[in-house]
Amino acid sequence: LGVKVLNNLSIGANVSYFWGDITRTLGMVYPSYTDIYGQTVSNSYVETTGMSVRDYKLDFGIQYTQPIGKKHSVTLGAVFTPKHNLNNDTYVQTNTSVITVKDTIATFGTPNCFGAGVTYKYDDRLTVGVDYSLQKWGDVTYMNQPNAFCDRTKISVGAEYIPSKIGRNYFGHVKYRLGGYYTTPYYKTEAGERASREYGVTAGFGLPVPRSRSIVSVTAQYVRVEGLQAGMLNENILRFSIGITFNERWFFKRKVD
């Protein structure tokens, strides 16, 4: 939902609804031993935690666009998501020599999130943008455990270029895109240290569909995840994706004079 409050100023809000189940299992196997009767004894411990979540989330945003001359413009934006504890039903099942099932009251939520960005546009053909976001996961309690996560930050840069808005050359209407990001994920090691950092580069094309306003997007992305602590794995990920954006006037009633 968005509202244009002034000529160049807009505000908006999003409402999201969460539902789903989370199951986490912890298992430990102890070394076997021989008792005084000569029997081999093996012990194990399995704890299963199940959570069913049903709740909502709110996002708020503001955007201001300042034209500069006839072909230039700068857009500033900011977003905010308030911290919110999610309604949930949680149980813990422990399996040793007997099975014990009990309900528990668990706290689990989403953090305060802040974001800001700036975009420069030239002649509706060149767009360059920078975004920064901060998610305060360090303030979130998970399964009644405080400080389970660390804050997540992300900075992204990107650009899109269209050679020509007019003309018959097909490749002149193709949208050429390039971007990159750097982020620090929110998960920790068992010692409470930040586990990894991540960065990626994306390149792609927006291919216009002939005699249509729809766009076919082809994208390739390289992602590098680096472990920051001893024993952590490094990951190299290569992704390819194809998508289509429909922008048709299906329900527009044509008029003939």
Name each region found by the language model.
Residues 1-257:
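Outer-membrane beta-barrel porins/channels
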